[in-house]
Amino acid sequence: MAIKQYSLKADSAKQLSPAFRVREFRCRDGTDTILIDEGLVVLLQCIREHFGKPVTITSGYRTASHNTKVGGSRSSQHLLGRAADIQVQDTDPLAVAAYAESLMPGWGGVGRYPVKSGRAKGWVHVDTRPNKSRWTL
């Protein structure tokens, strides 16, 4: 699948899937450009449908400067539009991570950030990199 470029100003309300719009992937620094991997949208839609609950993207695409500001890796998949940090309403992040791993058994990144890792509800990082990567903070 392809990585597509969108404009926050022009494409904000564009529906990418039944549950996701372009604006949900925006960089939190307010930049107009948003990169989004079509495969990431498919992955997130599968997670949404499996749990039957809203999926909140807490971090999607990041510019290099914003990635540095938030302490992201220099090789972060967020820079390419291939990653999202997510929370599924009323769902344990470890259950979300386990399901994401089942969707990508030999590829993709899944990071587990349980409740103790800083955000009250914890979160899960998912990305569509071609190789397999798993970690827990």
Spell out what each predicted region is:
Residues 28-30, 55-61, 96-99:
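N-terminal start-of-chain detector that recognizes signal peptides
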Residues 1-50, 119, 130-137:
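Extracytoplasmic cell-surface/polysaccharide-interacting catalytic and binding patches
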Residues 12, 20, 65, 70, ...:
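Solvent-exposed, flexible loop/coil residues
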Residues 75, 79-84, 88-137:
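Catalytic cores and adjacent binding grooves of peptidoglycan-active enzymes
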Residues 36-43, 53, 66, 82, ...:
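Amphipathic alpha-helical interface surfaces
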Residues 35-37, 62-67, 88-90, 101-104:
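A short linear-motif detector with a strong N-terminal bias
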Residues 41-71:
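Extended, low-complexity, intrinsically disordered C-terminal regulatory tails
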